[in-house]
């Protein structure tokens, strides 16, 4: 029987953890759709009435799209991070669990924004929304920190990519904190910043700096 390649054996050690994480991301992103409700109108309903009711629910659509895109990008970044990791330890497992805990909470502030974005309570709804994503960014940095400082990365990952990833992950917290502060004056601007951030992260995920992995001897 042919000997198993070292790369394959390294990947198997984190395979279960990544599969479990993928399942949590999938559930969280699916739960977002629950807040999209079909309008209930009594009596004979005209197309105009239905259209007006559908349009009046625009905060729900905005919150759904932003949250869906954000969770999707979080999953992409999580997947990209695990491409660099070849083993785990207890700290890494708990850091990943903390991140997943926060990811499953995303539908709650999304529902708050959907319900109260056009009301006088919009400030609190947006503060909670931005605050959660700021904490999620802290969780991402903890996960990355544990991978780097506990020597869980693949041996051929260069210092260049480590520094590039670290800078990228550190950008999130001050950005969401800024959106949180702005929410006290303009909830709509705050939500706009969140939308711009997921656009930025999606572009950044495509423009990742080359990994510059050194080829291992076969």
Named regions from a protein language model:
Residues 2-218:
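Multi-pass alpha-helical transmembrane bundle typical of ion/small-solute transporters
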